[in-house]
């Protein structure tokens, strides 16, 4: 594939994915912006409550990205029956996980918040939000599965349209429900949760509406689920289970990081939530690159074009370095501008937010490279077992222990706790580069 064809295919996938990620990330930022006027406790409470949603979505992400490894290779040879089976399996697993998370979050919202903090105001705000927001979990799981299938089969614009609809609805309903407009009572954090529920319903409605008119691998009667043969499940679990385990334990690691930040204090927690929301906006380009990388490499390997896959992997690695440096520098050098989005935060949280963004901008460079290596190259090449071992070891043997020691034992300020957590990325980038250039990451899963 020449350079022009490479970039055309990359942008065709990356731009819709990046735009969808931008809207999704801005939804989270919008929630934080609106809630910021309610005080530090509300920001911290909603941020900690969303750790449950974060863990849940990462498990769903694992199910769907693991499935997309098979999607890409089988779609590369247009094996529609296998693609349908993969879609069935991912929908079934995502639904089961979402129901479990929904019931736990609805039944024990305040107990979950108390695992992070003993601040009564934070627990109250977070618990109130979590009990209502849990209603979105099943809907979100379906949106993830259907959107992932559409992207992997060459239709990234459909989930983008659905997310745009959700974004507009969330902004509108959040505004009227949080602050009590159009004759409605002001509901605060509960209003933010209700706004999210309505937005998710609209998103899944758009997806289902389009899919009913889409002649392809998504039109599958539910009764076909029982016809999936044992041989398929063997291949499916071999590829997807490492990704599911990877994302689950990586997400748990992020939850532990937030627990460490909460040890520093409520203002530190609020500042971290704001900084993470801002960085989430910057990370959308990386998500687009990662999706392009995984799908393009998977399709090339499925077609047995191994040399093309190797060459494209190197191109994506170079792009990740350039992207990380440019965006990381902007993030580090402009915190005073990005924090203007949050006009009602306390001076202490504002100062901490500036310091955190400067530090996180540097770490962002490594996060970008690692995302392309793990999510793009290793998963696109079917090297999911190695990716799992790499991420789990770096999170649980490096990042989590250091951050907990920094906050709970050494009592360091939150900026240094974030740096300790960032040691995960330093370790990962060294080992990840070695794996990519060993060329042991290429695994062809399609049987001719």
Model-assigned labels for residue ranges:
Residues 17, 21, 32-33, 69, ...:
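Transmembrane alpha-helix boundary and packing residues in multipass membrane permease domains
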Residues 43-103, 140-159, 258, 271-335, ...:
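Small-residue-rich hydrophobic transmembrane alpha-helices
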Residues 64, 133-152, 159-170, 192-207, ...:
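Short runs within selected transmembrane alpha-helices of multi-pass transporters and secretion channels
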Residues 18, 22, 26, 30, ...:
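Generic alpha-helical transmembrane segments of integral inner-membrane proteins
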Residues 12-28, 132, 166, 199-203, ...:
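Transmembrane helical elements of multi-pass membrane transporters/channels
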Residues 22, 26-44, 113-120, 176-187, ...:
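Helix-terminus/linker motif at the lipid-water interface of multi-pass membrane proteins
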Residues 1-17, 71-136, 186-241, 297-363, ...:
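Short alpha-helical transmembrane segments in multi-pass integral membrane proteins
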Residues 35-54, 120-125, 189-190, 231-239, ...:
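Interfacial/gating helices of multi-pass transporter permease domains
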